[in-house]
Structure formats: structure tokens, C-alpha cells
Amino acid sequence: MQSPHIPVLLQEVLDAFDDFDSGDFLDCTLGYGGHSKALLQAHEKLRLIACDKDLEALNFSKEFLKKFQDRISFNHIGFKDILTQIPTQNLRGILADIGVSSLQLDKNDRGFSLNSDFLDMRMDQNNLLSAKEVVNSYSKEALEQIFKDYGDLAPVASMLTQKIINARSQKEITSAKELSQIIGNAKLKGRNVSLALLVFQALRIEVNNELGELKSLLENIEKAKLKDCKLAIISFHSLEDRIVKNTFKRWEKDCICDERAIKCECGKGHSLGKILSKKAISASKEEISYNSRSSCAKMRIFYFR
């Protein structure tokens, strides 16, 4: 059985956890099982806690990883909540791949791709909010803010929003294909990506509360007070990467006094561990050549002492 999704930064993930000895490993975003399968093969004493809010992906991976079923517990739950639901005392590794899988992007009825006949974009099909509702019911001001914040489209956000408002006043926008035609194929100056792709990114982030979920995951990881545990997070756009980078920096700080303070008053001793990736780890040219979607991937690693 073959996975329909190519896991990004696979070798880099294996390298990050090459010193894993034994204990529990949490894959916060199991998806179609590519990373987890490689880790299970590499580490015979690894016990996998696998979770995903996409039930379709979870059911696929149960079959895909059947060979290792006695070492896996499967959980249909979003990654932001998993740390509150599992024992953490034996947790030695955590991986979170905060991206949309190839299958989700390519599957017509999920409504992620520009040519889809649907306008959905929900990673969890139980969620009530879809891209169709956002596009057709959000106010002009709300849509404009989403495009500015999540699509980095400030120079053209007002113009793009007006196009959508004008179109939906004539008839409901019901497909991704229709929306991409409304937006058009133009590109921002100096950016090698279409406006439509950036609009779709912004809508997907809004529909799935992606930044909020990532922040909640990081908060729950911090509250878990992990010891001797390595965390690797793969993100796909600058907003996510910035959140991870800044959180890791804060976790590493020994002194938490205001930077303007003349001398330390906190007593130090607040560091949770160490950043193991001073710079974000990116895909190699070789990987990008056979998996173009890996070109945006960035991985950062933190070790909890």
C-alpha cells in the first residue's frame, strides 16, 4: 500500500530524531502517515501517538500503518488539543506538520484547489464554517482584513474584496473555480505567486483557524512541562514560521525581565530548553525538484531539557 502524499523534509525529520532511543512519540498531524512510517521503521522501540482531525486521512493511515498497529494509538482530534488528552511523562518526541496534504489539495470535493468545483477548504469536515460561507457572508471589512493578515495582500486587498462583493451580489459564489476566475491570474509586483493562490491561502487559514490552532498547540506544549523531549514543527508560510520562531526564542530565554530593565530581577532559571535549529531548515534542491510543494516548508526544532 502506497501513500498518496509525499511527506516533506522526510530525511530532515529522520535526522532530527536520529538519537531517539525509546518512549512515546507524538505525531500531531498524522495525515497519510509518511513521516510516522519512516520513524516507526527507524526506531523499533518507538510508540506512536497519532492524531489528525481529518477522519479520511486517519482511516487511510490505520490501514497504511497496519504493520505497526501494536505500537500505535490513533486519535481523531485536532492537534491543538492532543496534549491535554494524553499522558506526557514518557513523551520523547513531537512532530507537527502544519500544512495541507497533496490529497486534500488535489481532491475536487475538498475545495482547496483553484480548479475545484466546490468551495469548502475545511480540514475537519465536522466544522461548520466553510470557505463558501466566508466568501458569501463575510462583510467587506472582514474579508479585506483576512486578505491583509493571512494573504499578505495589503496593497490589493480592497480591490480584491470589491471584486468578490460585486460578483456575489449577482449570484452566490459556489466553486473554487468560479472564485479564482473572479480574482484573476495577476501577480503582485516582485512576487512569483498569483493573487488567487494568496486569496485561497488566506481563506484556508480563516476557515481552519490555523494560526489560532498553532498558538494553542504551543501553549499546551508549554503547559505540559516536558522533559527530555524534542519538538519539530514544519510550517509553510511566514505567519506560522514567525509564531514558531518567536515562541522558541521565548522558551529558550533564561531571563524573562523586560528588555529595558537595567539588571535582572527575575532570578533567571526560566529557560525550558534549547533551540536546535538556529535557522529554519528548508527543503533541498533535489527534494524541490520532485516535490515542488516542499519549496515553502520550514522546520524548526526545540529540545526540552
From Swiss-Prot:
Subcellular location, record wording: Cytoplasm
InterPro entries referenced in this protein's UniProt entry, alphabetically: RsmH (IPR002903), SAM-dep_MeTrfase_MraW_recog (IPR023397), SAM-dependent_MTases_sf (IPR029063)
Enzyme class: transferase
Catalytic activity line of the entry: cytidine(1402) in 16S rRNA + S-adenosyl-L-methionine = N(4)-methylcytidine(1402) in 16S rRNA + S-adenosyl-L-homocysteine + H(+)
GO annotations of cellular component type: cytoplasm
EC number: 2.1.1.199
Keywords per UniProt: Cytoplasm, Methyltransferase, rRNA processing, S-adenosyl-L-methionine, Transferase
One of the protein's GO biological processes: rRNA base methylation
Binding positions (S-adenosyl-L-methionine): G33, G34, H35, D52, D97, Q104
Molecular function in Gene Ontology: rRNA (cytosine-N4-)-methyltransferase activity
Protein function: Specifically methylates the N4 position of cytidine in position 1402 (C1402) of 16S rRNA.
Recorded family membership: Belongs to the methyltransferase superfamily. RsmH family.
NCBIfam families: 16S rRNA (cytosine(1402)-N(4))-methyltransferase RsmH
Protein name: Ribosomal RNA small subunit methyltransferase H
Gene name for this UniProt entry: rsmH
